[in-house]
Regions:
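Active-site helix of classical SDR
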Residues: 107, 143
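The beta1-alpha1 cofactor-binding region of Rossmann-like NAD(H)/NADP(H)-dependent oxidoreductases
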Residues: 50-61, 89-90
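Substrate-binding pocket helix/loop in short-chain dehydrogenase/reductase
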Residues: 83-84, 91-93
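SDR active-site lid
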Residues: 160-231
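Residue(s) in the substrate-gating loop at a strand-loop-helix junction
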Residues: 127
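Active-site loop immediately N-terminal to the catalytic Tyr-X3-Lys motif
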Residues: 85, 132-138
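N-terminal Rossmann NAD(P)H-binding glycine-rich loop of SDR-like oxidoreductase domains
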Residues: 10, 14, 18
Length: 247
């Protein structure tokens, strides 16, 4: 039985991906900062483990407890929404620690077993803001664009060992907690000079008429990356992301 470890399974894309792989007969290691086993159906093929991707000890313990893996999905992330002038450097570092360095650290932790076995897949979930930049998201976009570049380079690095690395690039989804955690970090404290721009951005978010991304779109893209060796290295997920990638 194949085993997948997914970070950030408390909601949204990670939770839906865990459900899909469970339904399709995989062993799933669903991780989150504070484990809640009731989020997923009881199964002998499910392990719900605590994981903080910014903590080296937490990573080591979780990877050891998970056992042999076939696929790693780096999905854990935090949002940050504000004008650059309104951000503290502490907030910016927190976003990079989770979104960028957390992804790198998790990948580094599982690579030895993949390389030694000559097989394995790494799937990094980023964001369509790397395809179509938006205001008030400069630091968040940078953290995700760094993961794109990391993954693209890593994919070449791992070819000699039979290990694959892929990007799944979701569009905007109301099914994620991005807005909630982004506004928490923003503190709703947009500098006065950017007030009008912020109002326009929030209004555009609320009035969007384009087709958005569903969590199931992302889960299916992760499934394809995990199971289809012929799939592209970059996979936009969701109608909006697909359209932006083609533009």
């Amino acid at each position: 039985m194949n085993t997948i470890l997914i970070t950030g399974c408390s909601s949204g894309f990670g939770l839906e991906t865990a459900r899909l792989f469970l339904d399709r007969g995989w062993r799933v290691v669903a991780t989150m900062r504070t484990p809640r086993a009731t989020l997923l159906p009881e199964s002998d093929h499910l392990a719900v483990l605590p994981l903080d991707v910014t903590d080296a000890g937490s990573i080591a313990r979780t990877v050891a407890e998970a056992g042999p893996l076939d696929v790693l999905v780096n999905n854990a992330g935090v949002g940050l929404l504000n004008a650059l002038e309104g951000l503290s450097m502490g907030s910016a570092r927190e976003v990079f620690e989770t979104n960028t360095l957390g992804t790198i650290a998790m990948t580094q932790a599982v690579l030895p077993q993949f390389r030694e076995r000559g097989a394995g897949v790494i799937v990094n979930v980023t964001s369509s803001v790397t395809l179509r930049p938006l205001p008030l998201l400069a630091v968040y976009t940078a953290s995700k664009a760094a993961v794109n570049a990391f993954t693209e380079s890593l994919a070449h690095e791992l070819v000699p060992f039979g290990v694959r690395a892929h990007l799944v690039i979701p569009g905007r989804s109301p099914e994620t907690a991005f807005g909630t955690n982004a506004r928490t970090r923003m503190g709703m404290d947009v500098p006065e000079a950017y007030g009008e721009l912020a109002g326009q951005v929030f209004a555009n978010f609320q009035q969007a008429t384009e087709e958005l991304t569903r969590a199931s779109d992302v889960a299916e893209a992760v499934w394809r990356a995990a199971t289809d060796p012929a799939c592209p290295m970059r996979l936009p997920a969701g109608a909006d992301a697909v359209a932006w990638a083609a533009a």
